[in-house]
């Protein structure tokens, strides 16, 4: 039997989730994203909890072969790109923001491939210096994209 190369390790940053029946926050990612990495990319998915203060980002980036940035319920908070404040009813995920944005920059610096879907594309944009309209459907001249 020939030697097999190890599967690439693809990091999937988690969103912080609050479930009504639990008093503690959960960290998770949608199964469709995990299966896309596992089955579609034939890679080993690794969910990265949103715990920014606990990571050495250069070390973390050096341990993964790719970074898959998923969609999520929350938008990137506007203070990361000097945008106007969110309204009070906007869903937030500051732990994900604080984990993902520096990790993206480090992956780009180290040449680790980065892929984004939905919110993940917003994260790449903001991490690399871009701005957002977090409610683009409310901007004059834009169609409702939802």
Which residues does each PLM region occupy?
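N-terminal beta1-alpha1 cap of cysteine-dependent amidohydrolase-like domains
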Residues: 1-115, 125-133, 137-146
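The feature captures the ABC ATPase H-loop/switch
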Residues: 121
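Conserved G/P- and acidic residue-centered "switch" motifs that form tight phosphate/ATP-binding loops
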Residues: 118
